[in-house]
Amino acid sequence: MSTTTEVIAHHWAFAVFFVVAIGLCCLMLMGAFFLGGRARARAKHTPFESGIDSVGTARMRLSAKFYLVAMFFVIFDVEALYLYAWSVSIRESGWVGFIEAAIFILVLLAGLVYLVRIGALDWTPVRSRRQSKPGTIKNATNSHPQ
């Protein structure tokens, strides 16, 4: 086969794949539109609480610390994947791979030290750290107003 027919065959297969994928997405969207319910009432936007009258809203404000911890977890988890792949191929990579992995680990440790120094991993606010003394323990059950 010549190169032009190979290129056309390759692009033809991709075009067929692309058209089928778009068609399948459109088919599922149309099916959901035609078969789905049409509830337009005000109660649609309230949370379902098993027959109990709802109290308050379903939206809760979360601290940004939760999102920071999630991002740190993803970052360090991906880095652990890289280190696992390196450990599997340590014989093939030799000393060059070992030095590269050592530099990678040092960069990770520098990032972790930086996060600790700026207080990104500290869950207590600065004002509560100043107020609490090292020898006292605050009772958490009596701290809420009644």
Swiss-Prot record:
UniProt keyword Transmembrane, yes or no: yes
Location in or out of the cell: Cell inner membrane
Pfam families assigned: Oxidored_q4
Gene Ontology CC terms: NADH dehydrogenase complex; plasma membrane
Catalytic activity as recorded in UniProt: a quinone + NADH + 5 H(+)(in) = a quinol + NAD(+) + 4 H(+)(out)
Domain of life: Bacteria
Molecular function via GO: NADH dehydrogenase (ubiquinone) activity; NADH:ubiquinone reductase (non-electrogenic) activity; quinone binding
EC code: 7.1.1.-
Transmembrane stretches, start-end: 14-34, 66-86, 96-116
Membrane topology type: Multi-pass membrane protein
UniProt entry keywords in alphabetical sequence: Cell inner membrane, Cell membrane, Membrane, NAD, Quinone, Translocase, Transmembrane, Transmembrane helix, Transport, Ubiquinone
Protein family according to the UniProt entry: Belongs to the complex I subunit 3 family.
Function: NDH-1 shuttles electrons from NADH, via FMN and iron-sulfur (Fe-S) centers, to quinones in the respiratory chain. The immediate electron acceptor for the enzyme in this species is believed to be ubiquinone. Couples the redox reaction to proton translocation (for every two electrons transferred, four hydrogen ions are translocated across the cytoplasmic membrane), and thus conserves the redox energy in a proton gradient.
Oligomer status and interactors: NDH-1 is composed of 13 different subunits. Subunits NuoA, H, J, K, L, M, N constitute the membrane sector of the complex.
Protein name listed in UniProt: NADH-quinone oxidoreductase subunit A
Gene: nuoA
